[in-house]
């Protein structure tokens, strides 16, 4: 009998349980469109969002709740997402700037920004809100008039964790 109990105890299984652990994470960097941009056609061959040309700059607001954890990356367009048929090349220019801040120290973002190609990066070192505007301009061919129609381009804004 002792041997039977010993043999049976070898086949005994321990009790096991799988216990879930869940959690939710709220975004610590949120991007909102404050104002949509609008191209103006100051001369026949040019579209521009610059107010001096009659355009409207798009404005994006970054709300950051953790200081020094994110980089703002904003890319101005180098093509139209939709437009009439174009038979010649476009020369694109653009820039992104700090427009407004909720904390005085954020004004340093402008001087510290880095630009690579058509992408501007800002090191978001302080918690709070920062507004960025992006200028975009496209000149068609060798000063050819742009065909009539609706032109749309996209500014890409993202928050990159450090």
Where are the language model's segments positioned?
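Positively charged n-region of N-terminal signal peptides that target proteins for export
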Residues: 1-4
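Short, surface-exposed beta-strand/strand-loop-strand elements in extracellular ectodomains
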Residues: 87-101
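N-terminal small/polar-rich segments of proteins
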Residues: 17-85, 121-162
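N-terminal signal peptide c-region/cleavage motif recognized by signal peptidases
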Residues: 7, 12-16
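Intrinsically disordered, low-complexity regulatory segments enriched
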Residues: 45, 97-98, 114, 136
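Extended, solvent-exposed segments with strong compositional bias
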Residues: 101-124
């Amino acid at each position: 009998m002792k041997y039977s109990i010993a043999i049976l105890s070898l086949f005994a299984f321990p009790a096991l349980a799988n216990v879930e652990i869940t959690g939710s994470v709220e975004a610590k960097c949120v991007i909102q469109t404050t104002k949509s941009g609008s191209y103006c056609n100051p001369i026949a061959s040019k579209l521009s969002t610059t107010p001096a040309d009659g355009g409207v700059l798009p404005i994006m607001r970054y709300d950051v709740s953790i200081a020094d954890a994110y980089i703002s990356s904003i890319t101005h367009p180098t093509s139209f997402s939709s437009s009439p048929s174009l038979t010649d090349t476009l020369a694109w220019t653009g820039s992104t700037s700090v427009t407004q801040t909720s904390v005085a120290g954020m004004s340093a973002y402008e001087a510290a920004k880095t630009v690579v190609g058509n992408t501007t990066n800002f090191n978001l070192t302080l918690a709070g809100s920062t507004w960025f505007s992006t200028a975009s301009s496209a000149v068609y061919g060798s000063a050819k008039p742009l065909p009539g129609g609706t032109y749309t381009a996209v500014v890409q804004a993202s928050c990159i964790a450090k």
